[in-house]
Curated annotation (Swiss-Prot):
GO terms for biological process: 'de novo' AMP biosynthetic process; IMP metabolic process. CDD domains: AdSS. This is Adenylosuccinate synthetase. Belongs to the adenylosuccinate synthetase family. NCBIfam families: PRK01117.1, purA. The active site is at D13 (proton acceptor), H41 (proton donor). InterPro entries: Adenylosuccin_syn_GTP-bd (IPR018220), Adenylosuccin_syn_Lys_AS (IPR033128), Adenylosuccinate_synth_dom1 (IPR042109), Adenylosuccinate_synth_dom2 (IPR042110), Adenylosuccinate_synth_dom3 (IPR042111), Adenylosuccinate_synthetase (IPR001114), P-loop_NTPase (IPR027417). Mg(2+) binds at D13, G40.
Length: 429
């Protein structure tokens, strides 16, 4: 039995898709426990590039059943567009299942998300405008629509009519937009009911029975630790808990069944959207990382903000997630840059902080304290063992390991599935 959680350790886009793709071929189930089509994965298989949003990266593994968990919010139009796109490229999606308890994104969620961001103006959080936040708000407010509701039209209709009593008042009176007809939303959902119904399962039951049989389960977290609604840079966060604890809740698998928690972390740092970012670069090196690393959001198309590696955040992520291992990605991007600064602590109004400041005010005032290490000039994209890496690259990885509070068990040296160095195989430990 093995239950592994994959979690982003920074602000997302760390390469979780690659990690899941590599491990997904060795497990029996891959479950996405949180998020929706607001976060994307890029996976390269056989030279083919796949950009996944709502679907787990494990969908590209023929041997694994992929599950969209109860902690997810599902836009059905986006789901089936993604499925159809993969099938058109020859991918098999017949092994995809959806938790009956997953929340559904309604057209009014998307409308409210988009208009509210415009209404906020300069105070906008920087959402993707896909209705994720409003859907989670309805979930917590106990007025959400779940996937299983499509199996009973009377319940579906009742929930939609009740929701629109309030939503339309908000759209019309607060945002000066047109009201949405309940029947329009009912028909939208019913148009997908026949296709969705065969996919629905009790995901908690399925996953726990699989573990009882000694099978392997991989939980593929969306977004990242610093976007967690509790542990991230609030309010510049997502609306779910993309941390280890949230993965347990969003999949229905208890914490005592988890055998490994794998943090995915870049050899530098990126962020999309608004919010504090202590190591952010505004010079030629920021542009270099953005260009060389291909740092453009899969979902939004927005350029990612880039900065140096932040070990304060890495230590924080190790602590709140209980990571057993790290998967370091994009080490190859740092080849040939001369010197590599590493943030080892923060200066906050003249006081050194080796750990995350307690308040967001302090974090906004944090300036990085750097140490530097020499970069390497050799091409590392063909390295397949740690010993094959140049000595300077080895030293950089070892220093990150010392600073981050967790062993570096995997190292990405290129975008391909095979461009990975495995130091400790967590499926064999």
């Amino acid at each position: 039995m093995a239950a592994i959680i994959v979690v982003g350790a920074q602000w997302g886009d760390e390469g979780k898709g690659k990690a899941t793709d590599i491990l997904g071929g060795q497990v029996d189930y891959v479950v996405k426990p949180n998020g929706g089509n607001n976060a994307g994965h890029t996976v390269v298989v056989g030279g083919e590039k796949y950009e996944l949003k709502l679907l787990p990266a494990g969908i590209l593994s023929d041997n694994a059943t992929s599950i969209i968990g109860n902690g997810c919010v599902v836009n059905l139009e986006a789901l089936f567009e993604e499925i159809d796109g993969l099938q058109a490229r020859g991918a098999d999606t017949s092994h995809l299942r959806v938790s009956a308890n997953a929340q559904l994104v309604a057209p009014y969620h998307v409308a409210i998300d988009r208009v509210s961001e415009r209404f906020l103006g300069k105070r906008a959080i920087g959402t993707t405008g896909r209705g994720i936040g409003p859907t989670y708000q309805d979930k917590v407010g106990r007025v959400g629509i779940r996937a299983q509701d499509l199996l009973d039209e009377s319940i579906l209709r009742q929930k939609i009519e009740s929701a629109l009593d309030k939503k339309n008042q908000m759209l019309v009176k607060m945002y000066n937009r047109r009201a949405i007809e309940p029947e329009e939303v009912v028909q939208y959902f019913l148009s997908y009911a026949d296709r969705l119904a065969p996919m629905l399962i009790d995901s908690s039951k399925v996953l726990n029975e699989a573990l009882d049989r000694g099978e392997r389960v991989l939980m593929e977290g969306g977004q990242a630790t610093m976007l967690d609604v509790d542990h991230g840079t609030y309010p510049f966060v997502t609306s779910s808990n993309p941390t280890t604890g949230g993965a347990c809740v969003g999949s229905g698998v208890g914490p005592t069944r988890i055998t490994s928690s794998l943090g995915i972390i870049k050899a530098y740092t990126t962020r999309v959207g608004a919010g504090p970012f202590p190591t952010e670069l505004f010079d030629k090196w920021g542009e270099y990382l953005q260009t060389t690393g291909g740092e453009v959001g899969v979902n939004t198309g927005r350029p990612r903000r880039c900065g140096w590696y932040d070990s304060v955040i890495a230590r924080y992520a190790s602590r709140v997630n209980g990571f057993t291992d790290y998967f370091l990605t994009k080490l190859d991007v740092l080849t040939g840059i001369g010197e590599i600064p590493i943030c080892v602590a923060y200066d906050v109004d003249g006081v050194r902080h080796d750990e995350m400041p307690m308040t967001q005010t302090e974090f906004h005032h944090a300036t990085p304290i750097y140490e530097t290490m020499p970069a390497w000039d050799e091409d590392i994209t063909g390295c397949r063992t740690f010993e094959e890496l140049p000595e300077k690259a080895q030293d950089y990885v070892k220093r990150l390991e010392e600073l981050s509070g967790c062993r570096m068990s995997y190292i990405g040296v290129g975008p391909g599935r095979d461009q990975t160095i495995v130091i400790n195989d967590i499926l064999k430990d």
